[in-house]
């Protein structure tokens, strides 16, 4: 591949879709068809490098690959970006699309248009991309090709004939798709003579080479040896290597307008190559950064503690190393009276939280326990400044003037027959309906504004069970709203157990308190004395369960005789148990914490 490629011969496109609609399989066939990967070296989900991606069959990190394709007797360079499909990684999708001029919207012929399809479509439209509608999995017996084609054409307001049919499994229609991309997608724009500007759309950590930064050149040329500058932080580095992924790394002398490739500077911290930032050079410095950069904000917070208290420093080291490859993790040290030393971590969503816990276990051999997920509340105590509270333990005591909770705009796509049960679920979760839109004769999109706290527990599971698995949903931050929230504490023998505290809506305080009290009463071993488990809001107890005492039969040795002898023994036992209740402590086994907290994730 020559170093200099004319912008007119470059086509940059992304593949976007809902989870499990065949993005990575289509990418595999494109790699084979263009000759980038030989049949011998080919494997499923070739671009998904993380073992979790391969096991779960999902894409977590965006991947860009440079391919060559001949069309109309001219050789073109195709830069293909395979993006994540899960709602947690929407920011990553939006920055990846900023590196493209066209987007292939992929819809599973067996599933039809789903919520994340619409969300990604809106992202593509915001980035002014040419939309190429494609129906995948058309070879499956269960595929409703005609119905899905009609639905996709209605959503995009295009002709039915414009929707392409492909099969990533068999390769049907893939050649025609690549030809269409070359003919319809616009070439990249940019000025080769102006100050260099490169958009960072992804960065990964390589244990041998340090941070590998994936970029799209928007203006100018950047060469090996140039001193580059990050426009958001002003940090400067010398460029050690420039190249493209083909799909394996292939070093080059330079990258110019329209090209997509990677930079290596030897930096070991991925936070210094922030996704969405603009790179320029020290000698010919650009003054205006590329638009759209923002730091992805964590939406869900949870405490992570090592099961073995001696592994606190190992957990810190594990999180530090994960942060190298995933800049969106946020964590600060915290202490729990029940669980010991750990970290309060911020995540993009529940899937992100699950993946981080799994990577800590698999990559660093750390067994951890996570507290129930919570969100960030804005709490204003009477006569004091507003506090941002992410941990129920930090909930202020005393009179509170106002509490605000974060809200999200939720889009739910479902077959029409389940609309009633979905509306019932959303209303139970304090959702406010914003609108409903029908697609064809079988599907509808429901728009709700809901508190984020109501969807981080089990909303997805409840939605799937009420719709037999057919509904899908997507959400975006919407702002915040005042709410009637309270802190529910769980007391064992009158002592608070901070690991079980939660901030909940006042209407759900009783149900939360009674359910967790009941669960604890079933899990905590019986003691020599009676143990009360109470759920309390401040000093007011809202729910209670009692673990009955283990009772020794002290009169077993009395085979007859005077009844007063038995009464004396029973009275002595009663006094001993009363004394034990005063001074006794309830030891809660680690397994009880694990079982109780895991049931509330």
From Swiss-Prot:
Organism annotation: Tropheryma whipplei (strain TW08/27)
Topology term for the membrane: Peripheral membrane protein
Limits of the tr-type G domain: 8-189
The protein's name in its UniProt record: Elongation factor 4
EC number: 3.6.5.n1
Tagged with keyword Secreted: no
UniProt-listed Pfam families: EFG_C (PF00679), GTP_EFTU (PF00009), GTP_EFTU_D2 (PF03144), LepA_C (PF06421)
Family, per entry: Belongs to the TRAFAC class translation factor GTPase superfamily. Classic translation factor GTPase family. LepA subfamily.
Predominant location: membrane
Its job: Required for accurate and efficient protein synthesis under certain stress conditions. May act as a fidelity factor of the translation reaction, by catalyzing a one-codon backward translocation of tRNAs on improperly translocated ribosomes. Back-translocation proceeds from a post-translocation (POST) complex to a pre-translocation (PRE) complex, thus giving elongation factor G a second chance to translocate the tRNAs correctly. Binds to ribosomes in a GTP-dependent manner.
UniProt subcellular location: Cell membrane
Name of the gene encoding the protein in the UniProt record: lepA
One Gene Ontology cellular component: plasma membrane
Entry annotated with the keyword Cell wall biogenesis/degradation: no
């Amino acid at each position: 591949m020559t170093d200099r490629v004319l912008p007119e011969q470059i086509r940059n496109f992304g593949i976007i879709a809902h989870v499990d609609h065949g993005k990575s399989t289509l990418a595999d066939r494109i790699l084979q068809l263009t000759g980038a990967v030989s049949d011998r070296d080919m494997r499923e989900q070739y671009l998904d490098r993380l073992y979790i991606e391969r096991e779960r069959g999902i894409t977590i990190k965006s991947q860009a690959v440079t391919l060559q394709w001949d069309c109309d007797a001219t050789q073109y360079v195709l830069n293909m970006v395979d993006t994540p499909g899960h709602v947690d990684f929407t920011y990553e999708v939006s920055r990846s699309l900023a590196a493209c001029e066209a987007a292939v919207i992929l819809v599973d012929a067996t599933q039809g248009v789903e919520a994340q399809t619409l969300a990604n479509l809106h992202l593509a439209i915001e980035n002014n991309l040419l939309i190429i509608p494609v129906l995948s999995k058309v070879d499956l017996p269960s595929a409703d090709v005609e119905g899905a084609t009609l639905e996709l054409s209605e959503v995009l307001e295009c002709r039915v004939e414009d929707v392409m049919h492909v099969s990533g499994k068999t390769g049907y229609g893939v050649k025609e798709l690549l030809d269409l991309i070359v003919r319809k997608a616009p070439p990249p724009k940019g000025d080769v003579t102006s100050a260099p500007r490169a958009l960072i759309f992804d960065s990964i950590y390589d244990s041998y080479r340090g941070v590998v930064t994936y970029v799209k050149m928007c203006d100018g040329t950047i060469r090996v040896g140039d001193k580059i500058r990050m426009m958001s932080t002003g940090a400067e580095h010398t460029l050690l290597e420039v190249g493209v992924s083909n799909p394996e790394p292939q070093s080059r002398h330079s990258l110019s307008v329209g090209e997509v490739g990677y930079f290596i500077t030897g930096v070991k911290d991925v936070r210094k190559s922030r996704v969405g930032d603009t790179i320029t050079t020290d000698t010919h410095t650009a003054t205006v950064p590329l638009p759209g950069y923002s730091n992805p904000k964590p939406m869900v917070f949870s405490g992570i503690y090592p099961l073995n208290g001696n592994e606190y420093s190992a957990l810190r080291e594990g999180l530090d190393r994960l942060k190298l490859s995933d800049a969106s993790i946020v964590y600060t040290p915290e202490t729990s009276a029940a669980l010991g030393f750990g970290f309060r971590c911020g995540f993009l969503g529940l899937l992100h939280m699950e993946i981080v816990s799994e990577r800590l276990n698999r990559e660093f051999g750390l067994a951890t326990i996570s507290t129930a997920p919570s969100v960030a509340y804005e709490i204003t105590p009477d006569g004091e400044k507003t506090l941002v509270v992410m941990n129920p333990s930090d909930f202020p005591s005393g009179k509170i003037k106002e509490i605000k909770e974060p809200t999200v705009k939720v889009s739910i796509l479902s077959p029409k027959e389940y609309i009633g049960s979905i509306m019932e679920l959303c209303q139970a979760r304090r959702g406010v309906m914003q609108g409903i839109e029908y697609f064809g004769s079988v599907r509808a999109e429901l728009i709700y504004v809901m508190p984020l706290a109501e969807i981080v527990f089990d909303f997805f599971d409840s939605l799937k069970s009420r719709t037999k698995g057919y509904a899908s949903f997507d959400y975006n931050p919407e702002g915040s709203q005042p709410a009637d929230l309270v802190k529910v504490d769980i007391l064992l023998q009158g002592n608070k157990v901070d690991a079980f505290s939660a901030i909940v809506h006042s209407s759900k305080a009783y149900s939360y308190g009674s359910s967790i009290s009941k669960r604890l009463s079933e899990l905590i071993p019986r003691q020599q004395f009676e143990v009360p488990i109470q759920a309390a809001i401040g000093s007011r107890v809202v729910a209670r369960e009692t673990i009955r005492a283990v009772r020794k039969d002290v009169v077993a040795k009395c085979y007859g005789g005077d009844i007063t002898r038995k009464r004396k023994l029973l009275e002595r036992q009663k006094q001993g148990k009363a004394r034990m209740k005063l001074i006794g402590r309830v030891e809660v086994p680690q397994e009880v914490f694990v079982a109780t907290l895991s049931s509330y994730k």
